């Protein structure tokens, strides 16, 4: 005679299977079968094999990203990180996620709460979290590597498209001669503020 279990005596790790329900059907094809043979992929498998039958190296499928772009012009540097020893402690600070909104403590007034919201990220840019000496060192490394990209572009009033003197003409022309500035690049792939400027800058005066 079988033992009858109710909900009170049945262990929680048992589950009920309805005999009237649909029967279980095993997965097809079985993942433990030789799927290469099942689907007739032997030829493709031999073409993309990493090693030959005798153990020698065959086709190299994977290439590093640097090898894929080596035919492009320009210089490509390793991003400074803590692991490669080029960025020190700066990378985890720059790329870390912030916690979001500040926590409103009990008894905090409206003005205190507003200041907490305004300055909630201030600690990220102060010691010991941010090492500004390390930031200056990393920037100087890029300046030495890409002097053409980090040269002092300078700011000139004629860069603004405003009628500053009320004459109806902007500052693009000084002394009756149009001043053209060229932004030269050394072929670097780095994005700099003036790297996308055309050689002949055309400015429009705002009406």
Swiss-Prot record:
| Transcription regulation as UniProt keyword | yes
Question: Known InterPro entries for this protein?
Answer: Mediator_Med19_fun (IPR013942)
GO BP annotations of the record are: negative regulation of transcription by RNA polymerase II; positive regulation of transcription elongation by RNA polymerase II; positive regulation of transcription initiation by RNA polymerase II; regulation of transcription by RNA polymerase II; RNA polymerase II preinitiation complex assembly; transcription open complex formation at RNA polymerase II promoter
Which Gene Ontology cellular-component terms appear in the entry?
core mediator complex; mediator complex
Record localization: Nucleus
GO function term, MF aspect, one: transcription coregulator activity
Sorted alphabetically, which keywords does the UniProt record give?
Answer: Activator, Nucleus, Transcription, Transcription regulation
User: What's one Pfam family the UniProt record gives for this protein?
Assistant: Rox3
- The segments labelled Disordered in the record are 171-207
Q: Which family does it belong to?
A: Belongs to the Mediator complex subunit 19 family.
Q: How does it assemble?
A: Component of the Mediator complex.
Q: What does this protein do?
A: Component of the Mediator complex, a coactivator involved in the regulated transcription of nearly all RNA polymerase II-dependent genes. Mediator functions as a bridge to convey information from gene-specific regulatory proteins to the basal RNA polymerase II transcription machinery. Mediator is recruited to promoters by direct interactions with regulatory proteins and serves as a scaffold for the assembly of a functional preinitiation complex with RNA polymerase II and the general transcription factors.
What protein name is recorded for this chain? Mediator of RNA polymerase II transcription subunit 19
């Amino acid at each position: 005679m079988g033992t009858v279990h109710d909900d009170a005596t049945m262990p929680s790790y048992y589950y009920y299977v309805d005999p009237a329900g649909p029967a279980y059907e095993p997965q097809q094809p079985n993942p433990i079968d030789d799927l290469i043979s099942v689907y007739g992929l032997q030829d493709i498998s031999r073409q993309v094999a990493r090693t030959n039958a005798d153990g020698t190296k065959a086709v190299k499928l994977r290439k590093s990203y640097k090898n894929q772009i080596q035919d492009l012009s320009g210089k490509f540097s390793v991003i400074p990180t803590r692991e490669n020893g080029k960025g020190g402690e700066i990378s985890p600070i720059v790329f870390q996620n912030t916690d979001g909104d500040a926590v409103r403590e009990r008894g905090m007034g409206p003005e205190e709460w507003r200041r907490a919201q305004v300055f909630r990220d201030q600690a990220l840019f102060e010691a010991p979290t941010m090492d500004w000496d390390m930031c200056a060192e990393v920037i100087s490394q890029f300046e030495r590597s890409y002097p053409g990209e980090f040269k002092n572009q300078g700011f000139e009033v004629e860069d603004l498209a405003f009628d500053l003197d009320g004459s109806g003409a902007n500052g693009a022309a000084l002394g009756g001669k149009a001043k053209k500035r060229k932004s030269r690049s050394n072929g670097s792939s780095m994005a700099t503020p003036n790297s996308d400027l055309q050689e002949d800058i055309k400015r429009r005066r705002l009406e």
